[in-house]
Amino acid sequence: YSMQPMQKQTLVPVELARQAVSEVLNDGLSDKYELELSEDNPGKAITITGDQSLLNRMLCNLIRNCIVHNPNGCRIQVSVGSCDRTCTFSVIDNGCGISEPQLNRLNNDKDISSTQKQTGEIEHGLGLKIVRQIVKIHQGTIQFSDTAPHGLSVEVVIPIEIY
C-alpha cells in the first residue's frame, strides 16, 4: 500500500463497518457464524479522514480472519466507538483464540506466516500484514487480546483527524 497514493476523504466509521459486514454477509456466510455490528456511542456522529477502500479492506480482513481461523463457527462482533479524538474499530470473536506466544508476537509487530502446523493449528499471515500497513498509514494502532472464556479481540484505534 505504500506504492499507491492514499485517497483521503471524510468518512463515517459506522458506515465503513456496515459496508464491511454487508460485504462478508453477501459473500455467503455459513450459518455456523453469527455476525453483528454495534455502535458504542449511538447517535454521536463522528467522521474520520482516510482511504475508504483501504479501511474497508482492513475490516473485511479482520472479519474473515475470524471465519478462517474458526472453522467450527463462532460469534463475531464488530463495533465502532470514539473517545478523545480517536475512532475505535473492534472485531471480537468467541472462537478458539490464539496461543500466548502468538498473541505476544502479534502485539510486538512480528510478521506471522500463514501456515498450518502439524497440530492443525493455522497461523495468521498476509491478511494481518496488510491490516497493519493500512493501520500504519492511517496513523493508528492495533492491539490483539484474549477474550474470556475464549476467543480473540482486535482493536484498531485511528485518529479522528489525520495530519
Regions found by a protein language model. Name each.
Residues 1-6, 45-50:
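Conserved micro-motifs of the catalytic ATP-binding
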Residues 65-67:
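Short helix-loop "hinge" at the ATP-lid/N-box region of the Bergerat-fold HATPase_c
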Residues 93:
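Acidic ATP/Mg2+-coordinating residue in the GHKL
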Residues 98-114:
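Short conserved segment of the HATPase_c
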